[in-house]
Amino acid sequence: MIELEVVIRTVASFGLLLIAERILGKQTISQMTIFDFIAAITLGAIAAGLAYNTSIKPHNMAISFSIFVLTIFLISFLSIKNRKLRKFFAGDPTVLIQNGKILESNMRKMRYTLDYLNQQLREKEIFNIEEVLFAILETNGQLTVLRKPQFRHVTKQDLMIAVNQEQRLPIELIMDGEIIENNLKQNRLTESWLLEELRKRDIKVKETVYAVLLGNGDIYVDQYKDHISVPMDKE
């Protein structure tokens, strides 16, 4: 009976989607890059075809679904290992506002309209562009905003120390055990300086997952071996 077959196929397709979710990992829609979004839509389309298209044999759809999941998994795995590949699929964040000035060339590249930019700022309770030090369009399409010091909410730290008026974006120095030489050159930093800073901390480049020069001049370093017990996400 065709109705019973559709029910079975629907349950099977839902089960395949759950398995795919377990393999590919947890991610919300708001965190998706363009690649993630395309992959999710394609998997959904294949699963939908398995559910209602009775003219196609179930095992053919299952094979197609499995191959696509495997392809996505391999690309994601390689992207974690290789920063250039990750940038190819996910892209780079784009600065849209710098020191209260809109960067029109970047807006055009991203096909980002002023109306949408103003909407995103209003959602963050910003009604004056001059309050913005940096506005960055992330790879997942979200807009992150850093206000100028005089327009930020007061914190306990602000009440204890004076605000440093000189502000800049953090500078990524090392990612996945590799020095980001382009960032060093653009910011007039040298590799010898970076290596010396790591030596002071008794850390090697290959041991470093992520190192960034913060806006206040401090260097944040995260190592592969943190020796931290994570209580969450254990099954």
From Swiss-Prot:
Pfam short name (any one): DUF421
Record key words, sorted: Cell membrane, Membrane, Transmembrane, Transmembrane helix
Membrane topology designation: Multi-pass membrane protein
UniProt-listed InterPro entries: DUF421 (IPR007353), UPF0702_alpha/beta_dom_sf (IPR023090), YetF_N (IPR048454)
Subcellular location: Cell membrane
Main location per the UniProt record: membrane
Transmembrane segments: 32-52, 60-80
GO CC terms in record: plasma membrane
Record family assignment: Belongs to the UPF0702 family.
Protein name: UPF0702 transmembrane protein YdfS
Organism: Bacillus subtilis (strain 168)
Lineage, uppermost ranks: Bacteria, Bacillati, Bacillota, Bacilli, Bacillales
